[in-house]
Amino acid sequence: MLTKRRMKFQYISCLAWLAHYDIFHLVPRDKNISYADLARAAGVPEQRLKSILRMAMTSSLFREHPNGTDVGHSAVSALLASDDDAYSYATYMCSKTAPMAMSMTEAHKRWGASTRTNETAYNVAFNTDLPFFDYLAQNKARMDEFARYMRSVRSSETVALKHLISGVDWESIPAGGMLVDVGGSTGGAAIALAQAYPHIRFTVQDLPENVETGEKAAAASLPADIASRLTFQAHDFTLPQPVRAADAYLLRMILHDWPDEQAVKILRNIVTAMDETKSRLFIMDTVLPKPGSVPISVERIARARDLTMIQSFNSKERELDEWKDLITAADPRLQLIGVTQPFGSAMSILEIQLSAK
């Protein structure tokens, strides 16, 4: 077992090395190249290159010609060479996720059970006193890398927008009703819903730079019948919600980034705007399974996401009971009226309303 674990660390180290020396792009897409020529192009020793590539080949990255002197792409390495988002996912895993994971022990030694967003494994790994997103914002290249990484994550079948579209009875919102996508980035979720449900109006809220990007893209590419139902609004969700009495508020992949104290504050800011006679709040996020309640391969992925939240933000993925506690802590009047996990989705949808009591 320990030997297998060692193989995984070595695979990550090979992936990082190959990306650093641009091997994915130096190997031609449609033909082989000799180890000697590839080593010269990359400026690395041929024997070192050969050792690292042959290790990578045991996990389906690249392939060696039977002559033993040439190398070409496999299906996986060709994908990474041709798809910028997939490549960014791989490089982010090597340059950010792996160092974070290895810094978790040191973070705990320094700060114990702190939930401060700038006392994390991420802070240790990258020697910064800034919270995750503040550190990203300092450097456009880091921001762009993270954006590509998130595009790759969101292209996964398990977090596809189709699960949001089919996972709620959106027809129950009356004609002309308003849905507010809180922290909706550049509007991807709202646009998908607008295409599927032409009777609903949408407000997408995010920080100014995301709102500006989304607004420009929508104006340039969306048909008038969709663009006319879509509004972008700059808003920090740690502040009170400005759109009052909407029919629905959506928090998709938001609260898992925040420790309980801040997550409660985000919820309270929405509660102050809700109308108890009609408003509903939908949270689409991971609901952690109970140990042993799902196949181990599924549970392993969920546990890995939980650790990533700890290492990045001192936050967490939450079990259902933890979600219930969080909702009650935000406001005892909030009632969880339904939990749905669409087939094939890694996330569940929690439907919440505000009672009159």
UniProtKB/Swiss-Prot annotation:
Disulfide bond residue pairs: none
Database matches in InterPro entries: COMT-like (IPR016461), O_MeTrfase_dom (IPR001077), SAM-dependent_MTases_sf (IPR029063), WH-like_DNA-bd_sf (IPR036388), WH_DNA-bd_sf (IPR036390)
Reported phenotype of the disruption mutant: Abolished completely the production of the naphthoquinones derived pigments and leads to the accumulation of four new compounds which lack the O-methyl group, including 6-O-demethyl-5-deoxyanhydrofusarubin and 6-O-demethyl-5-deoxyfusarubin.
Biological processes annotated in GO: methylation; secondary metabolite biosynthetic process
UniProt binding sites for S-adenosyl-L-methionine: D206
SUPFAM superfamilies: S-adenosyl-L-methionine-dependent methyltransferases (SSF53335), Winged helix' DNA-binding domain (SSF46785)
GO MF term list: O-methyltransferase activity
Pathway as given in its UniProt record: Pigment biosynthesis; Secondary metabolite biosynthesis
Inducing stimuli: Expression is significantly up-regulated at the end of late growth phase, in the presence of Butyrolactone I. Expression is positively regulated by the pgm cluster-specific transcription factor pgmR.
Class in the EC hierarchy, top level: transferase
Domain of life per record: Eukaryota
Active site, renumbered: H256
EC number: 2.1.1.-
Keyword line: Methyltransferase, S-adenosyl-L-methionine, Transferase
Similarity-based family: Belongs to the class I-like SAM-binding methyltransferase superfamily. Cation-independent O-methyltransferase family.
Functional description taken from the UniProt entry: O-methyltransferase; part of the gene cluster that mediates the biosynthesis of pleosporalin A, ascomycone A, as well as a third cryptic naphthoquinone derived pigment, all responsible for the coloration of conidia. The pathway begins with the biosynthesis of the cyclized heptaketide 3-acetonyl-1,6,8-trihydroxy-2-naphthaldehyde by the NR-PKS pgmA.
Protein name per Swiss-Prot or TrEMBL: O-methyltransferase pgmB
Organism for this UniProt entry: Aspergillus terreus (strain NIH 2624 / FGSC A1156)
Lineage per the UniProt record: Eukaryota, Fungi, Dikarya, Ascomycota, Pezizomycotina
Gene name of this polypeptide: pgmB
